[in-house]
A protein has these predicted regions:
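Flexible "cap/lid" loop of the alpha/beta hydrolase fold
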Residues: 140, 148-176
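Catalytic histidine-centered segment of alpha/beta-hydrolase-like enzymes
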Residues: 276-285, 289
Length: 303
């Protein structure tokens, strides 16, 4: 691998990391960072919250980094020791040194990371979109390490991607703002777009900036495609699990996803977030935070 991997060049690496560090200055609470060695490479972790708080690990969506949690981190880190992770096989400051081929590699990487961070066997794990799917996979593979599992609008996991996902993904990979914004972000984040106020417009532009910076600076890596869990897999989950989805979710019909879980795996708690889609953590931040914290604090040993 070249010295500048996973970037396209030394210049691209410098450009992206400068942009990333500038965006990171907007993190709204005190944090410290660690670059953690694992058998799959170096993982960058942003840590916030009380040092004696129960561990809460956050996994980002695809084509994003730990910074995707900026809207929610203030509330989450008030009581929990929050570890916001840069996916080792996506954008951010993490760098894989071993090939990542499938979900097992991803969950083994996470297990290495949790051991290196000395998080013990009572971890709260939460993921958004791709991170939600990865959370479900870790829940299946390493349930004894988890206390609670939270899936926020998980990609696939419950329902297959819609047919339009493929062509939207192809068009949004064209390195121009118009295609990324028009065919992917404005579609996924339609509720944010509809707000059309100054802060929402600014946030949408930042999301486009983030995506384009990664697209322009990173070399192509074969993506890991999220899968749909089988009935048996969903039924096998015994630890306390929460599934949150926006009523206007574009990746799958929210009501049908909830119906499947309620029928096949009623032990998984489900909630539909009103007036939100895949942007639920952005347009309904307070409601999502409230539901997540209520779920986490229920039967918390520190309560």
């Amino acid at each position: 691998m070249p010295e500048y991997y996973p970037f396209k060049s030394h210049q691209a690496k410098e450009q992206y990391l400068n942009y990333y560090d500038q965006r990171a200055q907007e993190w709204p609470v005190y944090s410290e960072s660690k670059l953690v060695e694992t058998s799959f490479g170096k993982t960058y972790v942003r840590i916030s919250g009380p040092s004696n708080g129960s561990p809460l690990v956050l996994l980002p969506s695809t084509s994003a980094s730990s910074l995707v949690w900026m809207p929610t981190i203030e509330a989450l880190s008030e009581h929990y020791r929050v570890y916001a992770v840069d996916n080792i096989y996506d954008y951010g400051r993490s760098v894989n040194t071993q090939n990542i081929k499938n979900s097992a590699d991803m969950t083994n990487w996470l297990d290495d990371l949790f051991t290196a961070l000395d998080l013990g066997d009572s971890i709260n794990l939460m993921g958004l979109s791709f991170g939600g799917w990865l959370t479900s996979q870790y829940t299946l593979d390493h349930p004894k390490r988890l206390r609670k599992s939270i899936w926020l609008a998980p990609a696939a996991t419950i329902y297959n991607f819609p047919g339009e996902w493929a062509w939207r993904g192809i068009l949004s990979a064209i390195p121009h703002r118009y295609f990324m914004k028009k065919f992917m972000l404005e579609w996924l984040f339609a509720d944010l777009l509809q707000k059309n106020d100054e802060s929402s417009i600014k946030l949408m532009n930042e999301l486009v900036d983030d995506a384009m910076m990664g697209l322009n600076c990173y070399s192509f890596r074969m993506p890991i495609t999220p899968s749909v869990l089988t009935d048996n897999e969903l039924q096998s989950i015994k630890i306390s699990t929460l599934f949150l989805v926006g009523e206007n979710e574009k990746l799958y019909p929210a009501k049908k996803a909830v119906e499947r879980l309620n029928t096949i795996a009623p032990q998984i708690q489900t909630e539909i977030i009103p007036k939100a889609g895949h942007d639920l953590t952005i347009v309904q931040t307070e409601l999502v935070n409230s539901m997540v914290l209520d779920f986490l604090m229920l039967d918390d040993p520190k309560d």
